[in-house]
Amino acid sequence: ARGTLTVLKTADGADYYVDSSGQYWRATLHIPDTTAFETADSDEMLMKSGAAFGAFQRMLADYPADTLHETIPHFHDTPARYRQLAEAALRDEAGRLREVTAELRFVNDRKADCAVLMDLLEKDRLPLRVTHNDTKMSNILFDRRTGAAVCVIDLDTVMPGLTAFDFGDSIRTGASTAAEDETDLSKVHFSLDRFRAYTAGFLGEAGDALTETEIRTLPVGAKLMTLEVGI
């Protein structure tokens, strides 16, 4: 099916190949008449991307996420990321602490926010889900003719996580008015229209599969993923 990545077997029947240097490789069937985009050029395209990742959540809603391997341990554990930053600041091994005091103050003022989602997970108020963990626009294939979202790709980082992580990382880049690496911060703003478009697409596909608490904390994910990448 065009909507699914199909892994090709090796001559030995394995799902991957290990070369002489220990590197792992795998191949998937080419999905014809599709293309990918680095950014969304319209709210409609952003809505379609939200629908694609929302469908990903819906289709895997009953999959036992705790059986998945954690490819990158503590990947979106924001409190752990904060602790790493605090420890690095104390060591100040490169002697550059004085150059980033304003940035550190910004993060420290938001320390309490870092643990909001992880605390809810630990209290069983948020369910552990199968998450993609790289929900950027370029990881969706679109039909060249119709413009419809066809397939979510780049599954190397699929592992246990929270729905808010995937939603939030999409918003971090998708609802921004500037590129991710923009150095002129006067150009970087949050677009509410883009946020609404993505959210409509995402909840249109995943809404019924999510709990009320999950839906309510999706915007928190957007805030935390932005803070985490800044950390």
Functional labels for PLM-detected ranges:
Residues 1-83, 160-163, 174, 179-186, ...:
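Conserved ATP-binding subdomain of kinase catalytic cores across diverse folds
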Residues 20, 45, 127-132, 159, ...:
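Secondary-structure capping and boundary motifs in well-ordered enzyme cores
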Residues 57-60, 86, 111, 115, ...:
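A structural signal for well-ordered alpha-helices, especially hydrophobic packing surfaces
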